Amino acid sequence: MLPFVQERIGLFIVNFFIFTVVCAITLLVCMAFLTATRLCVQCMTGFNTLLVQPALYLYNTGRSVYVKFQDSKPPLPPDEWV
């Protein structure tokens, strides 16, 4: 074979290797970003399920009980108790 052809084949192999490495690194970076995003979403969902929802439930229940008992106040004590 001519030296020019061997040089072109070698250049093609080197370029293909560089392209493969760049694609692999890009793929790894994208996978790491997507995995981190998914982990953040799962943590937010767990935080919402374990802390926010029970807190809202307790707050709403306490508020409804407070409103319910605000409407029915106990009678004042007799005057002789004062």
From Swiss-Prot:
Intravirion side: 38-78
Key words, A-Z: Apoptosis, Host Golgi apparatus, Host membrane, Membrane, Transmembrane, Transmembrane helix
Cell compartment(s), UniProt: Host Golgi apparatus membrane
One GO cellular component term: membrane
CDD domains (alphabetical): MERS-CoV-like_E
Gene3D superfamilies, per database record: 6.10.250.1810
Membrane-crossing residue ranges in chain numbering: 17-37
Residue intervals annotated with topology Virion surface: 1-16
Membrane disposition: Single-pass type III membrane protein
InterPro entries for this protein: E_MERS-CoV-like, E_protein_bCoV, E_protein_CoV
Principal cellular location given in the protein's record: host cell
Protein function: Plays a central role in virus morphogenesis and assembly. Acts as a viroporin and self-assembles in host membranes forming pentameric protein-lipid pores that allow ion transport. Also plays a role in the induction of apoptosis.
Subunit and partners: Homopentamer. Interacts with membrane protein M in the budding compartment of the host cell, which is located between endoplasmic reticulum and the Golgi complex. Interacts with Nucleoprotein.
Entry's family note: Belongs to the betacoronaviruses E protein family.
Protein name per the record: Envelope small membrane protein
